[in-house]
Amino acid sequence: MKTEIDILSDREVEIWDYAESQNGTMDFVTEKLAEEGIFDQYRNIHKSYLELYFRIDDEGAKLEILKRLIFLNWYAQVEPSCYTGIEDLDNATVSESYSILNQYLIDGKIDAEFKWMLSFYSSWDYTILPFSENKLEALTAFVKGVDTSILSCPKNQLPKGVMDNRGQMGIYWISMSVEKKIM
């Protein structure tokens, strides 16, 4: 039986597949996706992750949900929406997820995987600092403390399949070759 997080992941992949299948200029595809409500659907997925975070008690699942929220916050700003189906995420959801992340940093609750992911996203500090500066001290310090001259994601080091079934976050990290290649 699929969990709620699996269902949200499947919905993410469906939207990504649909966006990827579109033809035309970036402007044309963006307009088409907007008219078809694709961006609204993704905004709802993003909000649903946050709602699920607050409904469950499993700390491992909460951490996974937070990883996906932070990825989507970042990805919505760095990748054109015509390729992802993600546009104009709800600012309250983005802010709340960064606030949760700030507390995780204070409490030392992020794992090694989340640390390298967040270090990678911090190379685009403009995606995080507007939400954290003068509000979320631990997150701001983390972002500003990252050495952006060093590639923070593991290349061909993670076990094959570790990024499977993790929504667009998993698709992205597979495309960045973080998993070992099978010879």
Segments (PLM) and residue ranges:
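Residue at a conserved register position within TPR or TPR-like alpha-solenoid repeats
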Residues: 73, 80, 122-125, 129
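Structural register within alpha-helical repeat arrays
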Residues: 69, 118, 123-125, 142
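A structural signal for the main folded, soluble domain(s) of proteins
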Residues: 112, 138-141
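Start-of-helix signal in alpha-solenoid helical-repeat scaffolds, especially tetratricopeptide repeats
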Residues: 63, 112, 116-119
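N-terminal alpha-helical interaction modules that lie
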Residues: 1-106, 143-183
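Structural signature of tandem alpha-helical TPR/SEL1-like repeats
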Residues: 132-134
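A short, structured loop/turn motif at beta-sheet edges
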Residues: 106-112
